[in-house]
Regions:
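N-terminal regions encompassing targeting/leader/pre-sequences
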Residues: 1-2
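Charged interaction scaffolds used for protein-protein
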Residues: 5-34, 39-43, 50, 59-205
């Protein structure tokens, strides 16, 4: 079968062209593939990758769903291109940055923390980004990185201290007691919990 080479971007928007351009398509083996770039689409994709959309899917299954969500014409993509397409998706999610993963459990969850993140990003952007008809994922991340002091920063700082066994300040302890449900990250539902959820939903229909 025909191999797949990651095409070298030759013009803005044709691939991963660095942080000064916003990639709008992927070039794989000389062919251009459309990609979904709006931050809402990417957050949905991350919900599947993180296992919250379907806890019963294994890692390979999650990535397969993510690829189908990211590439609208994934069904037409030669299977030989899948590894390069996966690499492109991973780089896109990281906004082209090469960052070392932090050890230990995650400190945030895009779904659980959505209200806090939306408030912080809207403050950084000077507008409610949820009302925008379109916002590129990289632009969304740039505003996310610009979130300063606020509830989201406080929640993440407390989670980090709890993870490392550090003592909380008195005001942090008060915040934790008052907003415990917001501070404590909820993991994906277990198969048993998901089955019970589906059973209850069936009773309501």
């Amino acid at each position: 079968g025909r191999g797949c080479r990651a095409g070298r971007p030759r013009s803005p928007g044709r691939g991963m062209t660095g942080c000064w351009c916003l990639p709008m398509q992927a070039e794989l083996d000389g062919a251009a593939y459309a990609i979904r770039t709006d931050y809402r689409d990417i957050l949905e994709l991350l919900r599947w990758l993180g296992g919250t959309a379907d806890p019963q899917l294994d890692q390979s299954g999650r990535w397969y769903v993510a690829m189908r969500l990211f590439y609208p014409t994934f069904a037409e993509m030669p299977q030989a291109c899948w590894p390069q397409a996966t690499d492109f998706l991973a780089q896109f999610l990281a906004a082209g940055r090469r960052e070392q993963a932090r050890p230990g459990p995650p400190l945030m969850d895009w779904q659980q923390d959505a209200p806090l993140i939306a408030a912080g990003i809207s403050r950084a952007a000077g507008q409610d980004v949820r009302t925008l008809p379109y916002l590129h994922w990289w632009s969304f991340l740039a505003w996310f990185d610009a979130i300063g002091e606020g509830s989201f920063a406080t929640v993440v700082a407390i989670r980090d201290k709890l993870r490392r066994g550090k003592r909380l300040e008195n005001w942090e302890l008060d915040f934790y007691r008052t907003h415990r449900a917001a501070v404590e990250l909820r993991g994906p539902a277990s198969p048993a919990q998901e089955a019970e959820k589906q059973r209850l939903l069936a009773l309501l229909q």
